[in-house]
Every structure is written in C-alpha cells, then in structure tokens.
Design a protein with these regions (language model features):
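Basic, often amphipathic N-terminal segments
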Residues: 1-103, 116, 120-202, 215-250, ...
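Conserved, mostly hydrophobic/aromatic
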Residues: 208
Length: 261
C-alpha cells in the first residue's frame, strides 16, 4: 500500500491529555473528527490554523519511529504483527512529568528531565522496525541533507533514514510550527497555563500506536494502539477492526489481507 506509516507514543485516547492536545491542534487522530480549539484571547483563528498546520496533519503524538514507506516484500499485516509482538514483550512504565517548552523554535510538550526508559523505547522502535522501512528517495535524502546537520546526524540520516534518532532523539509532542521569538514567548506562556494541570503527574507509557498517511498532504490517522504486555484476544480483534476500518478508505486489496488474519 502506498503512503507512509509511523510508530508513535500517544496519550490514552480516553484521557484528558489526549483531549487537550487534540483540541489545541483541532483534530482527533483516532476518530478523525475536527475538534473546536479553546484559543487564547490574543490568538486569532487564522493565525492558529497557520501555527498548527503541520502538527495537526501529524496528530498529537511523540515520534518513536519516524514516518516511512513500507519496504518491498512486506504487507501492512506484517507490520501489524510485528507491532503486536513488540508490544506484548514490554511492560508499562512511568516517564517524568511534561512541560511546555521551546524546542528549536517550536513549542512542544517535553519531559521535565531525561528518561532512560523513553530513550530505550525510541531506540528499540527505530532499530526493530527498520526492516519494514523502504529506503528514502534521492530527493528526500537531498532535502534532509540540505538542513544544517552535524556529522553524526548526517550519519544517522544515512543509516536510519532520519537524523534525530538514537542519541539525537528528544521526546516531544509538537504543538506549533516554528515561530518568531516575540510571539513565541507569549504563546508559550499561554499554552503552559492551558496544559498546567495535565503536566504535573508522571506520564504513563503503556503502548505504541501505528499511524498511517495515505498521501503527502493527507493527515496521519491512528490505525491501532498496541498496549504493552497485552494478551487480550478480544481487544486484539476490536483493534484489528479499527485497522480494517481505516485502511478500507484507501486500498481494498490490503483490506482483504488484513481482515483475513
């Protein structure tokens, strides 16, 4: 199937953090529904739409395995099975609380302090699922190399298809596009107040989520969430129906392969 897949961390879709993040971005990546944002008084709707355009398309998430096209010889069902196996072998854990921060000109939710467990999870996702990643096109590699990368980031780009992985990884849930400094400081303070009550407790990391983007400008959709340590066959079947429902919008041939599992 054409399009790109990605493996993300997402908060519990039933929880307040997911609702707040989806509301700010204006879209729920699980349901696909538009969500009415509660904007700060000083922020107009046109400016908000511009500031959140790319984050809204990607959905509220933290990247674990950056977006990739499926390698030749693999089908979506193979990736789903690998996600099941990966999640089944892991246990839930807590990461430090979040905070709203300036990340290289973007506003994002980041951890209050480093987490070895989060870093290990991201590292494992990058390496374990790399066999499913098709090599980037020459144009994609050239575009990435045009950015200001360190020598190490350039080496990571060539090895893993993305420069900000392994020791260059930084856990974050993006809230805005890159912004100019004057407006960024004011909006950061507003968003810190918006998310304040939701960023006081440790973050429960209890699964991974598989997302799919059918075309370059289309939004990423959550195909399925894989709880850590889960052996619940009924939940598995419900989740598989979710995968089938989303993919059925794009390619009936791949739908048949998934639904025959």
């Amino acid at each position: 199937m054409k399009g790109r897949y990605a493996i993300y961390f997402t908060p519990d879709p039933r929880g307040a953090l997911w609702r707040a993040g989806s509301s700010w971005l204006g879209r729920d990546a699980v349901t696909g529904a538009a969500v009415e944002p509660n904007l700060p008084p000083a922020l107009g709707r046109p400016q908000w739409r511009e500031l959140t355009e790319a984050p809204r398309r990607y959905g509220f998430h933290a990247t674990l395995k950056p977006p990739f096209r499926l390698a030749h010889g693999f089908e979506p069902v193979d990736l789903v099975s690998a996600c099941e196996d990966f999640a089944r072998s892991r246990a839930a854990f807590f990461a430090p609380p979040l905070r709203v921060a300036d990340v290289d000109g973007f506003i994002a939710l980041t951890l209050h302090e480093p987490s070895a467990a989060i870093d290990a999870l991201a590292r494992d996702c990058v390496s374990v699922f790399d066999r499913f990643r098709a090599p980037p096109s020459a144009a994609e590699t050239t575009r990435r190399q045009a950015a200001t990368l360190t020598r190490r980031q350039g080496a990571l780009l060539l090895r893993w298809g993305y420069p900000y992985v392994m020791e260059e990884f930084r856990f974050h849930l993006t809230l805005t596009e890159r912004m100019n400094q004057p407006g960024r400081a004011a909006l950061l303070n507003s968003l810190a107040a918006t998310f304040d009550r939701l960023t006081r407790a440790p973050v429960r990391v209890d699964g991974i989520a598989l997302f799919f983007q059918p075309s370059a400008r289309a939004p990423f959709a959550a195909l399925r969430r894989f709880p850590f340590g889960s052996h619940d066959d009924r939940a598995k079947r419900r989740s598989e129906r979710r995968v089938v429902s989303v993919l059925s919008q794009f390619d009936k041939k791949d739908l048949a392969k998934l639904s025959s599992r």
